Amino acid sequence: MLGLKEKICLYGFNNLTKTLSFNIYDICYAKTEREKEDYIKYIDEQYNSERLTKILCDVTEMIGAHVLNISKQDYEPQGASVNVLITEEALPVALIDPSCNKGELSYLELRDSVVGHLDKSHLTVHTYPEFHPNNDIISFRVDIDVSTCGKISPLNALDYLIGSFDSDVITIDYRVRGFTRDVDGRKCYIDHDIKSIQDYIDEETLKKYDAMDVNVYQSNIFHTKMMLKDIGLNNYLFNSDPYELSPNDRREIRDRISKEMIEIYGGVNIY
């Protein structure tokens, strides 16, 4: 959980904006055109707007916020987007803008209590399937942004987000912007202790990944990259059994998947 060793008594509303940008990459080996098409269809169905909405609503609950409005869309030929407007405190229905749907979907209950509207607090998710006809490696990227103002922090949902997707490579950015004031009028540019994003990820999860930080502490910018250590071919072959392949083929495919992950992890073409 977030917090300072010594609590700061703030004057008025906490104006700090905390933004978490979370990108995961799922890698797959698909040799034939049919396998590529089937994988894209599978991913498109597996991570459609309905499921993504459920994930964002779970995140909203985990960080202690409340849904004001949801907009979602599935795209053709593939991809999906969801945007959720949230509030730190639940609003009485009479105070909610009539254009907001209050997240009234089949798996949500309408909450009606207390006050406080944070119109810059939101969650968004977009999906990006990617493949090339000359390449047997397919990737699928999920881009999630969680932006909050007030006391709530998006860092509390990191483990859930990592576990919600097949996360082979992960890039996470966290920044704090704006300032708030204490009761003496002194500006405060961050309201919690943080040395690394990794501090908010479960140790058992971190053991599965190689991780690296690039932080700019004086600017309240934190960046973590993670790459899965174990490449088990059964998790990367789509509709194929690795034991039906020769040892040389398995070695070659594992090597190609590893190179693809290293390039995505480093953000540069190497091989």
Swiss-Prot record:
State the EC number(s): 4.1.1.50
Which transformation does this protein catalyse, written as a reaction?
S-adenosyl-L-methionine + H(+) = S-adenosyl 3-(methylsulfanyl)propylamine + CO2
The molecular function terms of the Gene Ontology recorded here are: adenosylmethionine decarboxylase activity
Please indicate which residues carry the site annotation Cleavage (non-hydrolytic): K120, S121
GO cellular component assignments: cytosol
> Describe its PTM?
Is synthesized initially as an inactive proenzyme. Formation of the active enzyme involves a self-maturation process in which the active site pyruvoyl group is generated from an internal serine residue via an autocatalytic post-translational modification. Two non-identical subunits are generated from the proenzyme in this reaction, and the pyruvate is formed at the N-terminus of the alpha chain, which is derived from the carboxyl end of the proenzyme.
Q: An example of a Gene Ontology BP annotation on this entry?
A: spermidine biosynthetic process
Co-factor(s): pyruvate
Annotated active site: S121 (schiff-base intermediate with substrate), H126 (proton acceptor), C149 (proton donor)
- Report the residues modified as Pyruvic acid (Ser): S121
Q: Which SUPFAM superfamilies match?
A: S-adenosylmethionine decarboxylase (SSF56276)
Has the keyword Lyase been applied to this entry?
yes
Coiled-coil residue windows: none
What does the record note about the cofactor? Binds 1 pyruvoyl group covalently per subunit.
Q: Is Lyase included in the keywords of this UniProt record?
A: yes
Q: Which keywords does UniProt give here?
A: Autocatalytic cleavage, Decarboxylase, Lyase, Polyamine biosynthesis, Pyruvate, S-adenosyl-L-methionine, Schiff base, Spermidine biosynthesis, Zymogen
Please, which domain of life does this record's source organism belong to?
A: Bacteria
Task: Copy the pathway line from the protein's UniProt record.
Answer: Amine and polyamine biosynthesis; S-adenosylmethioninamine biosynthesis; S-adenosylmethioninamine from S-adenosyl-L-methionine: step 1/1
- Protein family per UniProt: Belongs to the prokaryotic AdoMetDC family. Type 2 subfamily.
Show the HAMAP family listed in the entry: AdoMetDC_2 (MF_00465)
Describe, as the record does, how this protein assembles with itself and its partners: Heterooctamer of four alpha and four beta chains arranged as a tetramer of alpha/beta heterodimers.
| Function comment | Catalyzes the decarboxylation of S-adenosylmethionine to S-adenosylmethioninamine (dcAdoMet), the propylamine donor required for the synthesis of the polyamines spermine and spermidine from the diamine putrescine.
Return the protein name: S-adenosylmethionine decarboxylase proenzyme
Q: What is the native source organism of this protein?
A: Clostridium perfringens (strain SM101 / Type A)
- The encoding gene is speD
